[in-house]
Amino acid sequence: MNNTTSDINDQRYEPREVEAYWQKEWASDDLYRTNTEVNKENTFYALSMFPYPSGSLHMGHVRNYVITDVLARYKRMKGFNVLHPMGWDSFGLPAENAAIEREISPSTWTDKNISQMKDQLDRLGLSIDWSKEVTTCKEEYYKWTQYIFNQLHKNNLAYQKKATVNWDPIDQTVLANEQVDAEGKSWRSGAKVEKKELNQWFLRITSFAEDLNKDLIKLNDWPDRVRVMQKNWIGKSIGAEITFEIKNSDQKITAFTTRIDTVYGVSYLVLASNHPLIDQLISSNDIDKLNDFRQTQEKLSDLERNSDTRQKLGMYLGVDAINPANNKEIPIWIGDYVIMEYGTGAVMGVPAHDSRDYQFAKSYDLPIQYVIKPNIDEDESYLNAEFVDKGIMINSDKFNGIESDIAKTQILEFGSNSNWAKPKITYKLRDWLISRQRYWGCPIPIINCKKCGQVRVPDNDLPVVLPIDIKLTGKGKSPLTTKTEWINTCCPKCGTEAKRETDTMDTFMCSSWYFLRYINPDNCEKPFLKSEIDKWLPVKQYVGGIEHAILHLLYSRFLTKALKKCGLINIDEPFKKLLTQGMVQAVTFKNPNTNKYFSKDQIKDIDNPKDPLTGENIEIIYEKMSKSKYNGVDPSVVIDKYGADTARMFILFKAPPEKDLEWDDSDVEGQYRFIQRLWKFVINTFKLTNNNSRSNIEKEKSKDEEALRLINIAIKEITDDLDNLQFNTAISELMKVVNGLSLIVNYCSNETLNKVISILVKITSPFSPHIAEELWKTIGNTQSIHLQSWPEFDAGAIEQDTFKLMIQINGKVRGSINASKNLSKENLEDLAIKTEAAIKWMDGKEPKRIIVVPNKLVNIVI
């Protein structure tokens, strides 16, 4: 660069030139390469959720990666061996759809985007060890995804079955339950999800439901919100399974309930429309009616079927069951709100004590039998609606008069002894559906042989490589079904002709173990080494968005536990600490009547905004940055104008990391001004220490002590803030110490000044690595600041021998003086009475009483 640090004066700091220089130097020196010769006690694994390579960073990315980078830099200076890697979650529909649109291969599109985004990440000054880079769509990575699938298959944790699945009609692929939003739409395309029956591959996540639920208690460094979301998704229910005999049949129906205390109130049963017993029980006269009913309810999403507000649809099966508790006959219905995949596919209808059952019973005029009443005898208002609270048993034979909670245990014991009930635990969690009918994904390493059935591709034959020369249309069956030369192969067992599996895996399969591959990404023999995993895992700090609370984070927890069961690793949880950073928001201009968004340039009068098309009032609110809302801010534009350090400082300072951040250009300007102020302060202070004429200036010992006190307070506060991930208050402390030191530097000794600016630059470096590196060299150092140790806090330096003594007259503050801390109460009284403030306000009067609060105040009562 033109101006080396040896000839810089107090000119303005030019970030673009300095940042480009140091980024090149860091890369050339391989400064951030991980030291692999480590022991577990001294490792720190700092990890951001890796991005999908869309081709451009957005401010949400910037916030995520800068947070992790600050922590990585800080921990290095604290003496830890830090692993701070980056990679690319590069399989998936967006690349395939982009390739179809542009008539290029997904790999070409992906490689180009990765190159662009890597340059953008480097411009942020991130301390990434690029030697650890992984890309999930590369053969050297997905070979091991296939290997992991094989291990799961060997251990009966991967299987195929015919299932009713969520079908995205736009993307032409299957979605897991977690990928369908609250409105029954695809999480990616937004299409209304349909139901379809297909042969699908599943991973047996339900085998780990109890461990996934129980071990949430270990994750006390995760946000409570995330743990609650996972707990609700796993959905553990403790209750009983009740067996109902069918009248005039040998068949039986089992139903799960958490409210066995209401069993005497069961007045009907409801089956899912695809319950296996229905076709055996229904009269031939009702088959057409049944088919019509099934077609109607198949159009509903699971969420719609479970909704409390929608009217439930049902159909009487024409067959009755026997309530085992009281031997009463009860009708068997089919209901659209019962889902076969949940529980047993049958529910007992207790309309008196369940809101959904009450609505259903009212719609079809079914009996409503109350078996629990409120504790207040005279209160009969409960008879006008469902009563869902605890109470006293009624109409329940020998259990009448007992509290319902106590009756649960007694009725379960009675039912168990009579062989119609047994204790049962169920989970809402369903097995993970990983089949996808698309091209750009990891091939499932299974070969279908007519003789041998499903056969795993041998580990030494992996990877099953995606064919390159393939025509993508985005319509119909999986593109792989068109590659007959790829499909046709030989059975690994018997050698006869066989066919490859044409489904690819859910991209979450690749992203649920990538944090393990980072440890040894160049290992050609194994996906990872157990001994190395033991050193680095679990990840000490994971940073990513709350939107991954159920999908990625739950799948990663499951796969970690599954790999432990397979004997591949020793850990059972992947991430020790989790930070879910808030969204980055910016101002939007929206017509609330049409929901149409406008850019700022389209609004003529910002103070009185109107829709440029209709003249209606415009709503100005902060929303998540988005191209469609015209409120996105390109990180490259900000870096070009202000530099990466300013962008980093703003993104860290504007809000606590877990809160949403509102973008404000004026606040960015404010951070830029602080960067300039920091630059000038350090440069000018350094020049002071080299100014021979200062030898004639009288130094004040108290100013040296004050400077050391200020810098040590900053060390303590910033260290505590970094340990607690409170980056905004850490930067606030930086600003405070610069302001405080600026007032006294002219009166401090050179020794103190050199010490203070050295510490200041060090504690600045995690936040603003470029300017810190430049300043570090400017003040005479040769080794990178990012290889220095974090300064130690000196508690003695912040202790003061004096304090500000407040002088009160009749309880009102009238002045203050500096006083020594070791003065007695009598000395403080004498000192206070002789002050100008006391003499003025006492006006010759004798004090009636003097109250002394040590090290704080003297109150003179007159």
Curated annotation (Swiss-Prot):
One of its GO terms (cellular component) is cytosol. A motif ('KMSKS' region) lies at residues 624-628. Keywords: Aminoacyl-tRNA synthetase, ATP-binding, Cytoplasm, Ligase, Nucleotide-binding, Protein biosynthesis. It is found in: Cytoplasm. It comes from the Bacteria. One of its GO terms (molecular function) is ATP binding. The keyword Manganese does not apply. A motif ('HIGH' region) lies at residues 51-61. Its main location: cytoplasm. One of its GO terms (biological process) is leucyl-tRNA aminoacylation. Gene3D superfamilies: HUPs, Isoleucyl-tRNA Synthetase, Domain 1. ATP binds at K627. Its EC number is 6.1.1.4. It is an enzyme of class 6 (ligase). The keyword Protein transport does not apply. It catalyses: tRNA(Leu) + L-leucine + ATP = L-leucyl-tRNA(Leu) + AMP + diphosphate. HAMAP family: Leu_tRNA_synth_B. Belongs to the class-I aminoacyl-tRNA synthetase family. This is Leucine--tRNA ligase. The lineage of its organism: Bacteria, Bacillati, Cyanobacteriota, Cyanophyceae, Synechococcales. The gene is leuS.
